[in-house]
Amino acid sequence: MNAMLETPELPAVFDGVKLAAVAAVLYVIVRCLNLKSPTAPPDLYFQDSGLSRFLLKSCPLLTKEYIPPLIWGKSGHIQTALYGKMGRVRSPHPYGHRKFITMSDGATSTFDLFEPLAEHCVGDDITMVICPGIANHSEKQYIRTFVDYAQKNGYRCAVLNHLGALPNIELTSPRMFTYGCTWEFGAMVNYIKKTYPLTQLVVVGFSLGGNIVCKYLGETQANQEKVLCCVSVCQGYSALRAQETFMQWDQCRRFYNFLMADNMKKIILSHRQALFGDHVKKPQSLEDTDLSRLYTATSLMQIDDNVMRKFHGYNSLKEYYEEESCMRYLHRIYVPLMLVNAADDPLVHESLLTIPKSLSEKRENVMFVLPLHGGHLGFFEGSVLFPEPLTWMDKLVVEYANAICQWERNKSQCSDTEQVEADLE
């Protein structure tokens, strides 16, 4: 009798277990996908000035909500992973010409040149000089998507191919790209200035490329001639301060570090003969490179210490990171500068964001833009599941560049009017 009374309770118990399991799974999904996070306009850090007021009026994306895809877009990890594996959705194939420049040390630098597909909104000749992220080049999907959009908005685009990054271009000297070497980017900019003497420049850098372009502009005042503005997206500002955070498991940074190190090893070893071959006349600093340590490296810091710093003869990793980071050059940039990071970027620790925040509080030419979501170079947009081909980042950079071009045009017209009035008096 007791058994007969107890059996009906068993299904209820099992249903309770199932319900608890489903609830646990849903909780994990909500937490992992960050579904409870709100959508909001980006946080903006700037000084009140005529320029900042004009930008807020002319760039709607600065004050509108950035709305990522509903299901997964609020996860910085998924945004970053999709950028890393997929690049972009339905990426176009812009047509350009590859240019070759022989550097003073025998290295062969390359960049791709893309002509505008429409007239610019202010009618001027404007060239975007673009520096991609680590080990990237003009054939990467996120670069192709951005270039195509910029072309359609009237920009000529010059995209640097990092030294050693293109698989079909051999190194012609025992040197490849490093974290902050500006030689190749500077050579590309000088080529553009010489070939198109009437053009004005918009400087754009993504991730590591953001460090390079900011360092380039701050190295000497002459590098800012003909430059209308600069945009840096998702850089970390200081390799020295970032190295400790990049070894932490928080936000899986140690795992990302391992993946990036593995990719760098493959690139370096693909050029082992040009870099380390017995027939190569290489600098003394490379002579003692222990390739066995490169094979076993599991972090970018180990690779930088064993190989990368030696390309430029740095005596220590600390010296390499101090000299190659743009942080010590940012205060020397006088052209309008927009720094963009995502709050959920798993590669850039929040402590590093104090650098652009502090700079924007001191300099009227600097605006720091910090959306809640976007990951590392993701910034996908879309309604529910599938992302759009064009990202929020692509649109923001072009919108900002257009606004700066208009700002400069207005200043020029005001100056001309004042000159006419002075002549009449």
Curated annotation (Swiss-Prot):
GO molecular function: acetylesterase activity; diacylglycerol lipase activity; hormone binding; monoacylglycerol lipase activity; nuclear steroid receptor activity; triacylglycerol lipase activity
InterPro entries associated with the record: AB_hydrolase_1, AB_hydrolase_4_CS, AB_hydrolase_4_sf, AB_hydrolase_fold, ABHD4
Record's GO cellular component terms: acrosomal vesicle; sperm flagellum; sperm plasma membrane
Glycosylation sites: N136, N410
Alphabetical keyword list: Cell membrane, Glycoprotein, Hydrolase, Lipid degradation, Lipid metabolism, Membrane, Serine esterase, Signal-anchor, Transmembrane, Transmembrane helix
Residues annotated as catalytic: S207, D345, H376
Cytoplasmic side: 1-9
Class in the EC hierarchy, top level: hydrolase
Cellular localisation: Cell membrane
Domain of life the protein comes from: Eukaryota
PROSITE patterns (UniProt xref): UPF0017
Catalytic activity: Hydrolyzes glycerol monoesters of long-chain fatty acids; an acetyl ester + H2O = an aliphatic alcohol + acetate + H(+); a triacylglycerol + H2O = a diacylglycerol + a fatty acid + H(+); 2-(5Z,8Z,11Z,14Z-eicosatetraenoyl)-glycerol + H2O = glycerol + (5Z,8Z,11Z,14Z)-eicosatetraenoate + H(+)
Pfam families attached to this UniProt entry: Abhydrolase_1
Membrane topology of the entry: Single-pass type II membrane protein
Entry's EC annotation: 3.1.1.23, 3.1.1.6, 3.1.1.79
GO biological process, one term: acylglycerol catabolic process
Activity control note: Acylglycerol lipase activity is activated upon binding to progesterone.
Domain AB hydrolase-1, chain residue ranges per copy: 128-382
Transmembrane segments: 10-30
Extracellular side: 31-425
Family designation: Belongs to the AB hydrolase superfamily. AB hydrolase 4 family.
Name the UniProt record assigns to this protein: Monoacylglycerol lipase ABHD2
Originating organism: Macaca fascicularis (Crab-eating macaque)
